[in-house]
Amino acid sequence: NTSASVDHDCLIEDFAHISPNCSLSGSVRVGKFSHLGTGTSVHPGIHIGNNVKTAVGSKVFKNILDDTVQKN
C-alpha cells in the first residue's frame, strides 16, 4: 500500500489490510481479517490477532487479542 513499510520476518495473514503509511517493525504478525488504520505503527515482535481493528495513527506496543478494536 502507499508508503507502508513492512520490515523483516513479518507475517501478514489472509485478508489482512495494511492501510497507507503503516509501519510494521521486524517479526510482527498480523492475523486474518485484521485492519490497521492509516499511519499505524507496530513495534518489533508484536502479535496482532484475528479480526482486529486499529484506529488511525495507533501506536501498538503490546500484543492485541482476537476480535479487538484498538482506539487511540
Label the model's feature ranges.
Residues 5:
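Short alpha-helical catalytic segment bearing the HExxH-like zincin motif
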Residues 2, 11-15, 19-72:
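Glycine-rich hexapeptide-repeat left-handed beta-helix
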